[in-house]
């Protein structure tokens, strides 16, 4: 059952307004940050994991490659000196794909495939990077860095690393990182505003009206000042960030449940069975919640409000998230490729029969980018 908000949290939620007054600051190398955050706009084709900070993986209608498009390797593992082995999906903006891996961070031209620049962060990155404030944010196991998207120059770096799943999220002038809990950093300077570590949390987070973090057996909500708001226990083991839409938090558990919680108080609205072995965030949009097949064979779509099952589609084994594109959803199968399905009916519109799909499909600039699980490189369709 969710715990009630504390008096301190209520006061914080009512009076915080912005994060500008949060001043629990530790060192961030900000001698010459050269970063100025403005309105987010629509500059980036795919700015962060889950497309947006709410992690819903929902895009408006956009072009997709033809069904006969061939997959071309973008990053190169051990085939050239200083190769990049990627454990994550890229961020995409201005015709460039930014990939973070175990040996370096690199920027690739989407048209030519040429590497524009590469940077060695000393310790590898195992989560996707994020774009915002005209800056690329990368979390390694030890620190978070702000890099110039143009040349990879370091603008600041600070000791708030990501030790387990959960990609950085940029919201306004704040970068949120998963460092055993949630840490809020000033996007312009790298200064630490606050750190919160809800009991049992740390598997991934989403940012909306509050910050929602999943962990073992629980989902927790924090205010934008870092104070505890509620914690729902007994949810089940969740190994990925939740998705947040229309006042509801959606979390998929490893043991085969999709749970919808009230974003305001953590009460459970509905709970429905899914395949076991789901390790990714649900995709949410247009009244549907779609989860991958996990260790089973079928992706499943639910009514977002009631939890009623709407359709199933056989993809085979898949442990990576779908992506919603307009009135369709791009559902991955590890060995069957990408299936573009009608979001309302589940009927297949298009199919890319590619093998070894190891990540969520990133839809950007008329292309589909993904990581292959066999070589840990990023490939491009289109």
Where is each model-derived feature located?
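N-terminal secretory signal peptides and thylakoid transit peptides that target proteins
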Residues: 1-18
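Signal peptide processing junction and immediate N-terminal pro/mature segment
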Residues: 25-29
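Aromatic (tryptophan-biased) beta-strands that constitute blades/sheets of beta-rich domains
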Residues: 31-86, 111-123, 151-162, 191-198, ...
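Cysteine-rich, disulfide-stabilized extracellular repeat modules
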Residues: 42, 113-115, 132, 152-154, ...
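Repeat-blade elements of multi-bladed beta-propeller folds
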Residues: 46-51, 83-103, 123-144, 162-183, ...
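Hydrophobic/aromatic beta-strand positions that recur at structurally equivalent sites within the blades
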Residues: 49, 108, 147-148, 185-186, ...
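Membrane-interface anchoring determinants
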Residues: 78-81, 100, 108, 147
